[in-house]
Structure formats: C-alpha cells, structure tokens
Amino acid sequence: MAKEKFVRTKPHVNVGTIGHIDHGKTTLTAAITKYLSYKGFASFVPFEQIDKAPEEKARGITINITHVEYQSEKRHYAHIDCPGHADYIKNMITGAAQMDGAILVVAATDGPMPQTREHVLLARQVNVPAMVVFLNKVDAVDDQELVDLVEMEVRDLLTKYEFPGDEIPVIRGSALLALEANDPNDAAYKPIQELIDALDSYIPEPVREVDKPFLMAVEDVFSITGRGTVATGRIERGKIRPGDEVEIVGLSYETRKTVVTSVEMFRKELDEGLAGDNVGCLLRGIDKDEIERGQVLAAPGSITPHTTFKANVYVLKKEEGGRHTPFMKGYRPQFFIRTADVTGEITELGNNAEMVMPGDNAILTIKLIYPVAIEKGMRFAIREGGRTVGAGVVAEIVE
C-alpha cells in the first residue's frame, strides 16, 4: 500500500537517462538524488540500489528498470534508469516507462559510441519530445579542445536524428565527483544544478492525455433493446460527452461517423468520460454488426486506418519465452494493436538483413491483412501460437 498521499502541487514530468554502457548514467542518477537530498527535494538513492534494478513486465517482456523521484523548484520528476542496454531497448519499445524527455549521458573520454547512436535513434522513433546532454567525466580529459570536439560530435549526432542539435543544452561535469562530494556548495555539484535547470527550462511540460483528441479502443460491443448499440473500452486520451461526434476507424478503409448519445460507467450515466475511464458509449444509428472489437472510436479526423508501416521491433530471446529460431521475410505472425488482433506479413527486414534472430532489435516493414487505426509512436505486441514473440513501436506509416 502507498505510505503517503501523492500531493500534486508541481507539474509532473517523466525523464530518464540514456546513453552508452559505462558512460555514467547510473552514477549521474545517484548524484542527482544526493545533491537534491541536501535541498530537501529528494531522498538519496545510492548507486548500488539503482544498479540492482527490479524486474517489471510489460507486454509479456521482462525488463529491469529503476525508478527514482526528485523535485526541482518548479517540477516533480520521475526518473528511470536501466542497468543493461537490452533493458533500454525493451523499455523504449514497449513504453513500459514513458519519457517526456531524456538525459543523454556521453563520456567526454569516449565521445558518442554505438549505443549512444542507437538510443538517440530510438528516442526519435518513439517520439521522446526533447533531450538534454550531460557530458560526463570531463575531469578525466586534460585537453579542453577535446571536450569541445566531443560536444560538436554529440550535437552533430542529435541533428542527424532530427533533434535540434544546435540548441540542446549540453552540461559538462563529473557525475562521480558529484556523487563523492559531501557539501551542497561543492563545485562538483554546480553541473548537477545546471542539469536540473536545463530539465526545467528545456523539457516541455507534457500535454496531459485528457487534453489530446478523443480516442477509445473498442473492447466489446453489445446491443441494448430499444436503445441501440454500446461500445465499451478504456478511454486512451481526450474526453467524450453525450452529443459528441466520433468516427469508427479500422477494419476497413471507410470510416463511419456517428454520435455518442450517452456515456456510461458502472451503469451510471456520465456528463463526460475522461482519459483513463472505462466506459460504454451508446452510438446513434449503428447496428451491433457494424462495429467490433479492434476498431477505435476517435475524434473525427484525428486518426486514420493503415495496413503498411515500418516498426522498430524487439524480438524475444528463447529464455524470455520467445521463438527458438530466427525468422525471414514473409513471416506471418499476429499483431496485437490496441484491441485489434490481426495477421500481418513481414515484407522487409531492415539493413538488408537475411533473417532476424531471437534477441535482436530490428527495423521491419509490416503489411497487415486489413487496415487498423495506427499512428507513429504507438506500441504493439507480436504473438505466435498464443505466446508473445516480440514487441514493437511504429516508426513510420507507409500506407
């Protein structure tokens, strides 16, 4: 049970550290909590505690994630850190812990490395809106010009993946020196404060789900004699009121418009249903056989049906309950997209690969046998014979 009530006085923002292995992500996370504990804005979480991240399950995949929380003068932050590279890939693809912004940690001693690139690419594909950079281990580099070069390299990398590389704040410091310091006025903490200020000013405040256009995936449909057809489901975003017009999207290229005449929850009528509510929507002029599970109700024009898309996919290892063998082009598993369960064919493997192995992270082109409401950045699961074999995120709509 929760020990204390979460008091919502400051805006809440989800962030996380990303970057190459051993560049100092976990050390930085610990240093932030230590510094802010002196200000009464956090509890210090030591390195060892963050490093032994507990297991979580998301979409049938086990992921190790540590969550810490801290505050600045202006905001409340939930911060995630993952111990292993594979955990980052899995987290970003499954969306187990969403990020409103990321802290890219790059060691000045190494510069950008393969996982740095991979994490930045993933952040772009899963729509992480903004990023700040912490250039770590600058105390270990004697030549200031080298640090300048590394910063230029990082900015170029960010620009390459369509982040505003020229304007992203880059903070230089040493997470280890900060973690070892015991006085909040120690010079080693100055970069930590600069980082917090950068988060406050540069990571935009997230748009609350309730302020986005209405969308509800249809879970079940039934008819009420004399009243009409009711579609039930959880409102993913936005809000719905009786009298609102919605579109039924998916399963064909034609979308149908209808009006929600009543919104009900636990058999009581609501003035409005909000993001997160499980509701039933009574639909005007729709027969029970004209709407089914797998479609969505959405604000008109806010989402369209598609069959073909590119996705970044993590394929489960055998030990994770996934496939024991690789798959090639032409593989036809089931795709679980919101409430839709649809067969699809993998028509292209990225990087001209011959096959995809269990444990791989790959870019695939997928063609579904019928259209589904899809948008960039949305998550899905891949299943075969009743077990999850992969998880993906839509990177680009093809048609």
Curated annotation (Swiss-Prot):
First-level EC class: hydrolase
Molecular function, one GO term: GTP binding
Catalytic activity, reaction form: GTP + H2O = GDP + phosphate + H(+)
Subcellular location: Cytoplasm
EC number: 3.6.5.3
Claim: Aminoacyl-tRNA synthetase is one of the keywords in the record: no
Pfam families: GTP_EFTU, GTP_EFTU_D2, GTP_EFTU_D3
InterPro entries registered for this protein in UniProt: EF-Tu_GTP-bd (IPR041709), EF-Tu_GTPase (IPR050055), EFTu-like_2 (IPR004161), EFTU_2 (IPR033720), G_TR_CS (IPR031157), P-loop_NTPase (IPR027417), Small_GTP-bd (IPR005225), T_Tr_GTP-bd_dom (IPR000795)
Recorded coiled-coil stretches: none
GO CC terms of this entry: cytosol
Ranges for region G1: 19-26
Stretch list, region G4: 136-139
Major location category of this protein: cytoplasm
Annotated positions binding Mg(2+): 26
tr-type G domain mapped to chain residues: 10-207
Region of interest: G5: 174-176
Keyword annotations from UniProtKB, A to Z: Cytoplasm, Elongation factor, GTP-binding, Hydrolase, Magnesium, Metal-binding, Nucleotide-binding, Protein biosynthesis
Spans annotated as G3: 81-84
Residue ranges of the region described as G2: 60-64
Residues binding GTP: 19-26, 81-85, 136-139
Family: Belongs to the TRAFAC class translation factor GTPase superfamily. Classic translation factor GTPase family. EF-Tu/EF-1A subfamily.
Subunit: Monomer.
Entry function: GTP hydrolase that promotes the GTP-dependent binding of aminoacyl-tRNA to the A-site of ribosomes during protein biosynthesis.
HAMAP family linked: EF_Tu_B
Protein name: Elongation factor Tu
Gene source species: Pseudothermotoga lettingae (strain ATCC BAA-301 / DSM 14385 / NBRC 107922 / TMO)
Name of the gene: tuf
